[in-house]
Design a protein with these regions (language model features):
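TRNA-recognition modules of translation machinery and tRNA-sensing kinases, especially anticodon-binding
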Residues: 1-367, 372-420
Length: 420
């Protein structure tokens, strides 16, 4: 067991790490284009933060959090999602007092105790953005546009954007009462989970994946059909802005998201990859969360989160290849101790000039050194032996053409800079 990673975790080895670097750097690039800056928060927070933000009745809080009491008697939780920690940090550091809106992005590991499956791990990696300080639908449109541009630029073409309005406290109270009345009349056909949800958070019943529930609740009332005039105006303007940017979308009345803090806009982005559909992103507006966590009143917010594991799996399913940028430029083959000693100055000169270079550390034969050079896909091999040392030269071999050139050691760096 000591040599096995814990269930639900996965090592990211060099054969995959470059793919992670690619999507992480692309996310940073796109966020920068939209004016978002990076935020880093601790990997663990006080448990109460997630109970108050994510919601006591959610599956995350009730079933999935990694929580413990530390040696100081504090209740601590490894973060199950990124938003709560960023909002907490904004309050603590008074970022809301800076130029509004405050636009942030993050890349972070998260932790949930759930059944591991393809694209879903107990330790997973979340990319996300949070924009605080504006309650306008134009910001909602920007957030969705950022996500769409990111997915498009990593190669996902067949995207489906689904949006919904989950109302505000004003219209939701009346709707929840109506929904609960409807669900009470259907109690005998609800699954066990929905029976619990109908009393604690009735709107979550809409999110049930149980086929029997879906069949028996086909006439369930939806929030978007009962929103107040303010929410309706907000939702209509959002749609106008998305159309202006040529972002295709559908209104999906069943989107409620799994977290309690969402208000007004909720959205998901689905990739129709080969053979199946995959939700690659979800988010929404969380007006009131800042105040709920102890911040000032009236600081609105919106954001989204996406799972890196699921994104990379979706890209793989779409046959999107990511080129490995890490290739060794030079391997130095040395013959004899004196040549090996001489190679270290050359290695330093090459690396100082940002030319990647390696040499042998296992005292291999010349043949084995060439074989290793080929294995690491070195572009050029430099050979230094007794003859070369006597003439202060080296043999430069182009590994793709097998062309060999004798060149002065003092000129080799400049020569390689011109060739690479």
């Amino acid at each position: 067991m000591l040599t096995k990673a814990p269930r639900g975790t996965k090592d990211i080895t060099p054969k995959d790490a470059y793919k992670w670097n690619y999507v992480e750097n692309k996310f940073r690039e796109i966020c920068s284009l939209f004016g978002y800056e990076e935020m880093r928060t601790p990997v663990f927070e006080h448990t109460e933060l997630f109970k108050r933000s994510v919601g006591d009745t959610t599956d995350i809080v009730q079933k999935e959090m990694y929580s413990f009491t530390d040696k100081g008697g504090r209740d601590i939780t490894l973060k199950p999602e990124g938003t709560a920690g960023v909002v907490r940090a904004c309050i603590e550091n008074k970022l809301y007092a800076d130029t509004q809106p405050t636009k942030l992005f993050y890349i972070t590991p998260c932790f949930r105790y759930e059944r591991p499956q393809a694209g879903r791990q107990r330790q997973f990696h979340q990319f996300g953005i949070e924009a605080l300080g504006s309650d306008k639908p134009s910001l909602d449109a920007e957030v969705i546009a950022l996500a769409v541009q990111f997915f498009t630029e990593v190669g996902l073409k067949d995207l489906a954007v689904s949006i919904n309005s989950v109302g505000c406290p004003t219209c939701r109270a009346e709707y929840n009462a109506r929904l609960k009345e409807y669900l009470d009349a259907k109690s005998d056909v609800l699954c066990e989970t929905c029976l619990e949800r109908k009393d604690k958070n009735p709107m979550r019943v809409i999110d049930c994946k149980n086929p029997t529930c879906k069949e028996n609740l086909n006439d369930i009332p939806f929030m978007v059909d009962h929103i107040c005039d303010d929410c309706k105006d907000h939702f209509e303007k959002l749609q106008t802005y998305l159309k202006e940017m040529d972002i295709n979308f559908v209104v999906d009345k069943t989107i409620v998201r799994g977290l309690d803090y969402y208000k007004k806009t909720a959205f998901e982005i689905i990739s129709n990859d080969i053979g199946s559909q995959s939700t690659v992103c979800g988010g929404g507006r969380y007006d009131g969360l800042v105040e709920q966590l102890g911040g000032p009143k009236g600081v609105s917010g919106i954001g989204f989160g996406l799972g890196a594991e699921r994104l990379l799996l979706t890209m793989e399913n779409n046959n999107i290849e990511i080129e490995n940028p890490y290739a060794t430029d030079i391997f130095i083959v040395t013959i004899g101790d004196e040549a090996k000693t001489k190679s270290f100055k050359l290695l330093k000169d090459l690396r100082t000039n940002h030319i990647s270079a390696e040499n042998d550390h296992l005292d291999r034969s010349v043949k084995a050194q060439f074989k290793y050079s080929d294995k690491i896909n070195a572009k050029f091999t430099i050979v230094i032996g007794d003859d070369e040392l006597a003439n202060d030269t080296a043999t430069l071999k182009n590994m793709s053409t097998s062309e060999q050139t004798t060149i002065k050691l003092s000129e080799i760096v400049q020569e390689l800079k011109s060739r690479l």
